[in-house]
């Protein structure tokens, strides 16, 4: 063993395979089974997570980590009394982990002993605190002392390895009790004998334990005062001054270097073997232990620093400072009854209650092993560090920190003891126990990194005037230190953490620590008191020792900048490396000169360089890390919503005759890319030839290149593709989906293209209005038709901007500045910030006011164009812009979409390559904090200038085509669709039918009936691409589930099966609801053996048991069709349905105005024809008073002989229509007392089949069985909601003719139109005609096309 950390030990180990030495940290924790304890394990793994992302020459290398589980019972005596301090210094003298070897938590295993009793050890010298003192024992006896009550224990342990044991009392002991019972029972016997000795002990300055060491034990918080008073009185009787620890909030300071004691207080020695270290380990009632160990490890609540440097062994606990978030770890679990643990493994009490075995987890972290020493060892050496060596080490530290910060990691505990030195005298930054990942970086860091010349213009000197008058940080009270961020070692901790004057801190906290470290490297201290005083002056007032600034000006400048109290004034690692203040390495100079030569692509060495670069192999850690797969994975429902969103958008684009054209992913760097407004965030890469290539930042530039390269003259295209944003080095670029619609054409047609593009925007906003505004309150919620949808489209024309700026008095040299500043108005800055920025760029207040007058005005497009025409009449350059806008107004008025458009002169979007018309579609999302908040959904414009700039032959630029396009923020729309779906489904399943309802969902008595109908349509709208989900309960039944799924696949049913086990039906239903799956088939082992399956419909929550052989037929009958998929059937208008039913229900009449007279087969106008039924909820016509053989023809309101062919789907949700022997009867007031009620069969579900008679024409015999099922499904949807009498039969003719042919067919006894059809269809039509005449006695006939799977209702023929 080579070291001991805050949660475990570090051992030196040799791998049996490669025979190399490694440092392995072992951390032992409880085996948590409660999910609530998972965050604790995650915190414990923070160091592993941090180290795994780092791989640098000057950072301790991480290899791997693993966890082993074990069941701990009472350990053996040998195991339970492992001496962690006996040979510690011998090992530490050779190993770099020596700094973390001594100062650690209690060595007592929580599972080895059930409790600890109190024992006393007299303490003298400088380590006595408040009379009570710390308990110290030498290496020979290795005794420990426990201070505890029923809920809190304090373990004080120490080690001494040499003759310094004479300073201590080896055979005396003393008890510090915090409980009356403990005091009475255990300390009276020993306290008297120690009274005289105790009086000689000098008082020490007491301090409070910092928030870093406070456990989160909230129990017995109110018992502190009573415990203290009781214990104080008893200790007073024993002649001793004791200190009570209340809820582990108070501690002792053994590090103040008060040398006013007796001559025995000389333990601070130059001899390394005479060193001494004390440790305070605390545990609360829950077993959480916290330790105060080193002179630089605790920030005292009193505001003072423990600065004693008595540890010449350089012991620095490698995890000895803790954030509050680490205080939840439980490392010890003592019972109320306590014992003393001595070196010979004997317990001082006679009985101990055994604890049951507990599962423990041991985390192993394998790291690079470094021998030699630390930077602290070099600093403490006689003579210190040479100036040249100090700069070399500083550069290595900065390079290592630069890598750490580039991974968005803050070390937070940078100090000499945590900077190791390897065999080659190079730096290795280690101890990442307090490092935090993903901490917010200060804004100044971002600004500095994005500024090209920031490094050269860095201000590395800061005046002392800004800090000289400030209150020293040591004057802070207790409250000022009780902050979460209060971590790190005091002398190296930055002011913003100690003073709590900032909510977030970034990498600049490490730069402050670096300043203190560099000062220690440059200045040799003679005594510890001198070190303490000088560092205090340096931190408080930036006061250097006399002569330091004159003899070391470069070092002074660096230190002064690093120790600036303002974090924004401290340089970053990158700025410091490029500042020129650090002497460059010789190899750097050589490399820079070489790069100047080989960077020329025309020489052969350039190819050699590229070849070598691309021959590099990645480190195995990079291969195993997740850095290049860091884009978050999406839920299945998100992916489904994305596909459905793309499908809905695609329908709109296809409706306009566009085609999908994708462009190449990579394209070379060019001047247009470099001037792009988002150029800083473009993802750039190098190919093997040394060409810089870009991933697309947007889809406009790649498309414009495609148009120019392929000489496209006319095109209307759309695309869905990814765009990318640059991430931190070593991470995948951020991926986003974008959709573009573009029109390329001749210049003369550009105005029509502009209007069509704006029409596309309107159609998209209307298509997604429910999703975009579904969560809004008021009239904007719901379907969107009842209230005004608050979206607008702002328009501007760049041809007007120059004229307006000239009108405002802006000089031309400021035009670009104004455009760039105003461009941020609608998404980053408000107008006050824009005005301030313009003033900072040199524009006068009056000019800014004039600009505001124009740019802040917006209004209705047509009206504003008229006003601008008169206002800019004297500016010739505005003529083109005014003319284009007037034409646009006319075109928008022609297609009746003008009211949605506003003219907004402040709209400036991608001015680098857009010219002419630009536009943006936005929605208003006001909040309490920002009532004018808007969100941009689409933007675009005319990019003729971009196409010209990419053209290889500028002389032909006048013949170049023009282009206009719109870009959609797909992710915003997809997220809106997803959120809207979740919102509706949450409401849907809260109001749907449950088993507790007495009436079924279809019953009129069920109050949830209307909600259920709405919810079903909602569920269908967001239905998954999977129709049936096959799963099992109890047993896995993987093979059986595959068989059932295969059975469904063979019938064309979209199905999937679960590969995981479910133990609850509710889990299955919940999964289906979340993923929009309408049906679930549940297999149980015993039921499956007899061929029975359980089927449940998720939307109605109805269950039934189905035989396996009937499963396919069941789903073919019951299949629900998603409104977003290609429906087999389509809805019709309510007027067409009314005409049909009205004509059918006119018993004995000739239709509405027809001439059929009293014919029982009247056609309503003299011609029999076909008609289809469409969906309608309103068809209340007259009652059918008798059951005579009356019939109806195809009548309509226009009283014409022509029939309107209508597609066949109908769904009656709240009506009762009867299919009887006389035809279709609409009976809105049907009741049980009706004369026909006894003959009525009510079908609760559309899956029940109607009574039919089917005649097949042109159908193979083998296919008739399957076709019959399809026909039944079609009829169930066609007559959904109808009631069929027992005596009625629906006649169906199944033919292989196309639906379009059947739809156009007209037949009567006097004439037909068969002659107009092609010869191929005539024979089949004649057969169909003959069958129709055979069934002319029936009121209607259903003709079903198996070719298109659609049906037509054909009325009677006369």
Curated annotation (Swiss-Prot):
It is an enzyme of class 2 (transferase). SUPFAM superfamilies: Class II aaRS ABD-related (SSF52954), Class II aaRS and biotin synthetases (SSF55681), Protein kinase-like (PK-like) (SSF56112). Residues 149-196, 258-285, 342-351, 447-466, 1185-1199 have a biased composition (Low complexity). Disulfide bonds: none annotated. Its EC number is 2.7.11.1. Residues 136-148 have a biased composition (Polar residues). Disruption phenotype: Subtle morphological defects such as an aberrant stalk structure; due to the redundancy between ifkA and ifkB functions. Cells lacking ifkA and ifkB display severe morphological and patterning defects. Mutant cells aggregate in streams that give tightly clumped mounds. Fingers form from the mounds but remain attached to one another, especially at their bases. The fingers culminate to give fused and entangled structures lacking proper stalk but containing some spores. One of its GO terms (molecular function) is protein serine kinase activity. Residues 1148-1172 have a biased composition (Gly residues). One of its GO terms (cellular component) is cytoplasm. InterPro entries: aa-tRNA-synth_II/BPL/LPL, Anticodon-bd_dom_sf, Gcn2, HisRS-like_core, HisRS-related_dom, Kinase-like_dom_sf, Prot_kinase_dom, Protein_kinase_ATP_BS. This is Probable serine/threonine-protein kinase ifkB. It comes from Dictyostelium discoideum (Social amoeba). The gene is ifkB.
């Amino acid at each position: 063993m080579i070291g001991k950390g805050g949660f475990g030990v570090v051992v030196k180990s040799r791998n049996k395979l490669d025979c190399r030495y490694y440092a392995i940290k072992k951390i032992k924790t409880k085996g948590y089974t409660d999910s609530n304890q998972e965050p604790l394990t995650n915190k414990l793994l923070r160091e592993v997570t941090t180290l795994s992302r780092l791989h640098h020459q000057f950072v301790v290398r991480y290899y791997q980590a693993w966890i082993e589980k074990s069941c701990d019972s009472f350990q053996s005596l040998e195991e339970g009394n492992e001496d962690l301090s006996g040979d510690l210094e011998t090992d530490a003298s050779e190993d770099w982990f020596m700094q973390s070897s001594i100062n650690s938590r209690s060595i007592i295993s929580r599972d080895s002993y059930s409790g600890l009793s109190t024992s006393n050890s007299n303490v003298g010298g400088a380590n006595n605190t408040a009379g009570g003192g710390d308990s110290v024992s030498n290496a020979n006896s290795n005794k420990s002392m426990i201070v505890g009550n029923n809920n809190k224990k304090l373990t004080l342990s120490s080690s001494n390895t040499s003759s310094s044991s004479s300073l201590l009392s080896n055979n005396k002991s003393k008890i510090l009790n915090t409980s009356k019972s403990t005091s009475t029972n255990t300390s009276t016997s020993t306290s008297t004998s120690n009274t005289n000795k105790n009086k000689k002990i000098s008082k020490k300055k007491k301090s409070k334990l910092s928030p870093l060491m406070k456990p989160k034990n909230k129990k017995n918080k109110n018992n502190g005062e009573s415990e203290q008073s009781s214990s104080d009185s008893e200790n007073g009787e024993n002649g001793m001054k004791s200190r009570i620890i209340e809820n582990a909030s108070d501690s002792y300071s053994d590090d103040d270097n008060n040398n006013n004691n007796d001559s025995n207080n000389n333990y601070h020695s130059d001899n390394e073997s005479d060193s001494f270290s004390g440790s305070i380990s605390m545990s609360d009632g829950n077993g959480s232990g916290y330790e105060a160990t080193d002179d630089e490890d605790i920030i005292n609540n009193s505001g003072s620093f423990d600065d004693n440097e008595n540890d010449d062994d350089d012991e620095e606990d490698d995890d000895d400072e803790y954030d509050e978030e680490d205080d939840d770890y439980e490392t010890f679990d003592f019972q109320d009854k306590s014992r003393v643990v001595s070196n010979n493994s004997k317990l001082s009490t006679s009985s101990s209650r055994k604890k049951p075995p507990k599962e423990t987890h041991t985390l192993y972290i394998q790291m690079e092993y470094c021998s030699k020493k630390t930077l602290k060892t070099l600093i403490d050496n006689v003579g210190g560090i040479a100036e040249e060596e100090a700069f070399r080490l500083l550069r290595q530290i900065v390079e290592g920190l630069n890598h750490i910060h580039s991974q968005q990691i803050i070390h937070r505990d940078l100090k000499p003891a945590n900077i190791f030195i390897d065999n080659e005298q190079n730096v290795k930054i280690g101890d990442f126990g307090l490092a935090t990942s993903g901490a917010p970086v200060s804004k100044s860091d971002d600004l500095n990194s994005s500024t090209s010349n920031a490094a050269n213009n860095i201000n590395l000197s800061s005046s002392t005037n800004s800090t000289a008058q400030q209150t020293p940080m040591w004057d802070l009270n207790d409250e000022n230190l009780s902050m979460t961020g209060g971590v790190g070692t005091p002398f190296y901790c930055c002011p913003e953490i100690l003073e709590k004057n900032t909510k977030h801190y970034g990498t600049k906290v490490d730069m402050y620590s670096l300043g203190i470290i560099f000062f220690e490297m440059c200045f040799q201290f003679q005594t510890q008191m001198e070190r303490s005083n000088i560092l205090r002056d340096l931190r408080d007032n930036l006061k250097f020792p006399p002569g330091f600034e004159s003899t070391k000006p470069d070092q002074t400048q660096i230190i002064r900048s690093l120790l600036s109290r303002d974090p924004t004034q401290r340089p970053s690692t990158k700025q410091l490396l490029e500042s020129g203040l650090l002497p460059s390495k010789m190899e750097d100079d050589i490399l820079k000169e070489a790069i100047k030569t080989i960077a020329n692509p025309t020489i052969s060495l350039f190819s050699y360089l590229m070849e070598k670069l691309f021959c590099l192999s990645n480190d195995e850690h990079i291969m195993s890390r997740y850095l290049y797969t860091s884009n978050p994975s999406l839920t299945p429902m998100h992916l489904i919503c994305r596909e459905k969103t793309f499908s809905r958008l695609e329908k709109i684009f296809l409706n306009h005759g566009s085609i999908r054209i994708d462009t190449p992913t990579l394209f070379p760097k060019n001047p247009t890319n470099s001037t792009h407004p988002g150029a800083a965030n473009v993802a750039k890469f190098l190919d093997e030839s040394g060409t810089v290539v870009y991933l697309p930042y947007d889809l406009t530039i790649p498309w414009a290149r495609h148009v120019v390269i392929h000489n496209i003259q006319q095109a209307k295209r759309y695309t869905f593709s990814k765009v990318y944003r640059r991430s931190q080095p070593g991470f995948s670029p951020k991926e986003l989906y974008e959709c573009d619609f573009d029109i390329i054409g001749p210049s003369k047609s550009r105005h029509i293209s502009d209007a069509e593009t704006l029409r596309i925007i309107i159609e998209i906003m209307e298509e997604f209005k429910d999703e975009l505004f579904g969560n809004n309150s008021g009239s904007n919620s719901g379907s969107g038709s009842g209230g005004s949808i608050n979206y607008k489209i702002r328009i501007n024309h760049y041809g007007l901007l120059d004229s307006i700026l000239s009108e405002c008095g802006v000089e031309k040299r400021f035009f670009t500045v104004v455009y760039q500043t105003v461009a941020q108005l609608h998404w980053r800055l408000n107008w006050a910030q824009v005005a301030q920025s313009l003033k900072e760029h040199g524009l006068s207040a009056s000019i800014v006011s004039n600009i505001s007058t124009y740019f802040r005005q917006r209004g209705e497009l047509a009206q504003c164009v008229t006003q601008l025409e008169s206002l800019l009449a004297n500016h010739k350059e505005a003529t083109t812009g005014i003319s284009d806008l007037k034409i646009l107004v006319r075109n928008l008025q022609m297609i009746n979409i003008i009211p949605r458009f506003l003219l907004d002169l402040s709209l400036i979007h991608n001015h680098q390559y857009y010219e002419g018309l630009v536009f943006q579609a936005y929605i208003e999302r006001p909040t309490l904090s920002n009532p004018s908040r808007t969100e941009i959904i689409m933007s675009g414009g005319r990019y003729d200038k971009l196409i010209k700039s990419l053209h290889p032959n500028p002389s032909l630029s006048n013949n170049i085509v023009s282009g206009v396009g719109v870009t959609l923020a797909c992710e915003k729309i997809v997220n809106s669709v997803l959120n809207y779906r979740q919102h509706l489904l949450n409401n849907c399943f809260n109001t749907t039918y449950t088993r507790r309802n007495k009436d079924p969902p279809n019953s009129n008595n069920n109050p949830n009936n209307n909600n259920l109908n709405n919810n079903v349509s909602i569920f269908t709208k967001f239905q998954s691409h999977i129709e049936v989900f096959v799963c099992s309960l109890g047993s896995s039944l993987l093979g059986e589930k595959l068989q059932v799924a295969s059975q469904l696949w063979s019938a064309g049913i979209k199905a999937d099966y679960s590969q995981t086990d479910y133990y609850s039906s509710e889990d299955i239903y919940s999964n289906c609801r979340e993923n929009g799956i309408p049906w679930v088939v549940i297999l149980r082992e015993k039921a499956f053996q007899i061929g029975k399956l359980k089927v449940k419909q998720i939307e109605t929550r109805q269950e039934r048991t189905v035989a396996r052989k009937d499963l396919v037929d069941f789903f073919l009958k019951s299949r629900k069709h998603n409104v977003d998929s290609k429906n087999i059937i389509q809805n019709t208008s309510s007027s067409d349905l009314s005409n049909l039913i009205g004509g059918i229900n006119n018993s004995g009449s000739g239709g509405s105005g027809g001439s059929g007279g009293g014919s029982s087969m009247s056609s309503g106008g003299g011609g029999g024809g076909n008609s289809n039924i469409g969906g309608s909820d309103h068809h209340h016509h007259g009652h059918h008073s008798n059951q005579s053989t009356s019939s109806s023809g195809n009548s309509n309101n226009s009283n014409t002989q022509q029939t309107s062919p209508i597609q066949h789907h109908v769904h009656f949700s709240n009506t009762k229509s009867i299919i009887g022997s006389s035809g279709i009867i609409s009976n809105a007031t049907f009741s049980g007392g009706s004369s026909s009620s006894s003959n009525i069969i009510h079908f609760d579900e559309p899956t029940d089949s109607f009574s039919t008679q089917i005649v097949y024409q042109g159908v193979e015999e083998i296919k008739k069985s399957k076709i019959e099922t399809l026909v039944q499904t079609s009829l169930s949807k066609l007559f959904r909601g109808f009631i069929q009498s027992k005596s009625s039969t629906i006649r169906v003719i199944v033919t292989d003719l196309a639906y379009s042919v059947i739809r156009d067919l007209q037949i009567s006894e006097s004439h037909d139109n068969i002659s107009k059809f092609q010869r191929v269809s005539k024979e089949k039509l004649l057969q169909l005609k003959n069958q129709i005449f055979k069934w002319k006695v029936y009121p209607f006939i259903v003709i079903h096309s198996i070719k298109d799977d659609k049906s037509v209702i054909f009325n009677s023929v006369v």
